[in-house]
């Protein structure tokens, strides 16, 4: 295991935001020891060419199996660095991002994940403002260390430990202790596939780390900014996708071995299934930022999420086998 931070960006055919993200990493006050771009099932050579021509110090690899968590696991295998700091291609890292991450992990070997404060890069459009009003990726100004701080109230409510999987950060800026995550089996490749499950890999690994007895630190000194989607429909779809993926992840957790107790998982799953209805009532009273039609769709998405994980596992296996088959044909041919 090599000391230091590898900053990893998983991307697919998005050269313009990727260029901006890479520039933010090149401008760190304490630069990461390594910067890695994982090009996930690209449609052409544009990303590879851009990295080669404009960022010669950045390492490029191509992961042929489509799916964000295939790309994340590829990053874990590609680097030998102790810490892998994942950042989405639509994120701009603050100048102290990498250094603050390194400082957090130096506090204790028990810390497996560090998340940070993610603010909006722009609030120019109605879609961006709606996403931020719904909560965005902000998690506040107070440092949180789990499980030590688990008895704090989350959004004013006492909650089970699994609730912190959505209350302590976001995958758009998430750093992990590489060996620990590999020992836990890596990211779940059945999540973040697009349809039927377009998210959930970050929530799943946050929960599995907590359930395994490791620590997570949310440190607002780890600062980044995220470019929210500009159109209202796109922002609403992202919110709905998040809720469907959350329910699928919770349903998976409810039937998986659980060291910290299944009752809290089941209780939180039941609450999240009911919550869109509660929000709809709040909206009718004028107290929820999302329109009523979006909350109705959210409720339906949550219930569909209950049965999505099994289908997503089958899809992940088909994608894996398809790529393996093409490789075997190429070698044999």
Predicted regions and their residues:
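N-proximal low-complexity "stem/linker" segments adjacent to membrane-targeting elements
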Residues: 1-26
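Acidic donor-binding segment of Leloir-type glycosyltransferases
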Residues: 22-62
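Glycine-rich, basic loop-to-helix element that forms the pyrophosphate-binding segment
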Residues: 63-79
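Short aromatic/hydrophobic "clamp" motif used to bind/position activated sugar donors
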Residues: 84
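Conserved donor NDP-sugar-binding/catalytic core segment of glycosyltransferases
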Residues: 96-141
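Short, flexible, basic/aromatic active-site loop/helix in glycosyltransferases
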Residues: 135-166
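A short, conserved alpha-helix in the catalytic core of glycosyltransferases
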Residues: 167-185, 190-222
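Non-catalytic, C-terminal membrane-associated alpha-helical segments of glycosyltransferases
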Residues: 237-244, 258-333
């Amino acid at each position: 295991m090599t000391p230091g931070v590898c900053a990893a960006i998983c991307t697919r055919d998005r050269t313009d935001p990727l260029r901006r993200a890479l520039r933010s990493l090149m401008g760190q006050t304490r630069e990461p020891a390594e910067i890695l771009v994982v090009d996930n099932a690209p449609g052409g050579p544009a990303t590879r060419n851009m990295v080669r021509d404009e960022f010669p110090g950045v390492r490029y690899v191509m992961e042929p199996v489509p799916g964000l968590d295939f790309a994340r696991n590829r990053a874990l295998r590609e680097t030998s660095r102790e810490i892998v700091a994942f950042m989405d291609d639509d994120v701009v890292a603050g100048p102290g991002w990498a250094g603050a991450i390194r400082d957090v992990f130096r506090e204790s070997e028990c810390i497996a994940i560090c998340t940070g404060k993610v603010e909006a890069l722009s609030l120019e459009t109605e879609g961006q403002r709606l996403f931020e009003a719904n909560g965005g990726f902000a998690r506040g100004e107070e440092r949180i260390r789990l499980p030590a701080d688990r008895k704090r109230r989350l959004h004013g409510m006492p909650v089970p430990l699994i609730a912190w999987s959505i209350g302590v950060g976001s995958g758009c800026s998430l750093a992990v202790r590489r060996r620990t995550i590999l020992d836990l089996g890596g990211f779940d490749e059945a999540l973040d596939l697009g349809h039927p499950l377009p998210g959930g890999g970050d929530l799943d690994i946050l929960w599995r780390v907590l359930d395994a007895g490791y620590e997570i630190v949310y440190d607002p000194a780890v600062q980044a900014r995220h470019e929210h989607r500009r159109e209202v429909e796109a922002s609403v779809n992202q919110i709905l996708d998040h809720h469907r993926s959350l329910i699928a992840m919770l349903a998976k957790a409810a039937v998986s071995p659980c060291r910290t107790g299944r009752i809290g998982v089941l209780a939180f799953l039941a609450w999240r299934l009911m919550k869109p209805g509660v929000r709809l009532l709040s909206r009718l009273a004028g107290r929820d930022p999302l329109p009523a039609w979006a909350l109705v769709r959210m409720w339906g998405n949550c219930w569909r999420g209950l049965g999505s994980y099994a289908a997503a596992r089958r899809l992940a296996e088909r994608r894996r086998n398809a790529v393996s088959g093409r490789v075997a044909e190429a070698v044999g041919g």
